[in-house]
Amino acid sequence: MRRMVSYGHSWVDGDGASSAGACLAALTAQGLGLELDNRGVGGSSSTGTAALVRADPPPSAALYLLMTGLNDLRLGGDSPSAIQQYRASLHTVLAAFRRASPESPVVAIAQPYLLDFSLYAPHHRGSNELVDAYNGELRRIAAQYPRVVVAEPAGWDAGTMLDEDTVHPNDAGHRCLASAAELAATAALQ
């Protein structure tokens, strides 16, 4: 069976989902008929994801899924070095995917808004304005690589799609993200 390899922060890892099968990565792979190799790591930043692909290069895959940056902006706030590290990390990860499977599509999921960034110090420096800035960088960098598409979670509603912790998606949020990823992947795979 062909596989999808996913990388990123706790949302990719499945935090907030009621079960492993209800997380965005599992739902996306299932919807596309792909076997899942989920390498998401809760609490990771983009630099952590970049370090992971440097230490253990990605395997070949029919599709790569990436969602990263939320912890960078929550911890780094509007620090210029934080967004620069995010940019460099995206280049590292996307280049690693291209080396592993040059023709395989990559779906990078844009980060949706949260309700409250003031909780969970020291990860309390973010804002939805920074989400917009990081998503802008994601779109700009993705456009520099062949077969990389950005999935935009249409219909995202932070009021109903975040878990009680206000940081992670609940099952409805995971379904929304998976739907966006599946739509982007289906278009990219044609």
Residue ranges and their predicted role:
Residues 90-95, 135:
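Generic structural signal for well-ordered alpha-helices
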Residues 2-6, 11-92, 129:
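Conserved SGNH/GDSL esterase-like catalytic core that processes O-acyl groups on lipids
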Residues 36-38, 49, 163-190:
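Histidine-centered active-site loop/cap adjacent to the catalytic His
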Residues 99-106:
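A short helix->loop->beta-strand "cap" motif at the edges of active sites that frequently abuts
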Residues 38-42, 110, 152:
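Residue-level recognition of beta-strand->loop/alpha-helix junctions
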Residues 116-152, 176:
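Substrate-gating cap/lid alpha-helix
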Residues 67, 109-110:
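Alpha/beta-hydrolase-fold catalytic nucleophile elbow
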Residues 81-88, 122-133, 165-173:
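Alpha-helix N-cap and loop-to-helix initiation/capping positions
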